[in-house]
Amino acid sequence: AADDVTVVIGSAAPMSGPQ
């Protein structure tokens, strides 16, 4: 995803929200 957005399924990184 861009950075660490809320829900972007398919990203690699630390998310802040529910996946």
UniProtKB/Swiss-Prot annotation:
Further remarks about this protein from its record: Found specifically in cells cultured heterotrophically.
Protein name (Swiss-Prot/TrEMBL): Heterotroph-specific protein
Species assigned in the record: Thiomonas delicata (Thiomonas cuprina)
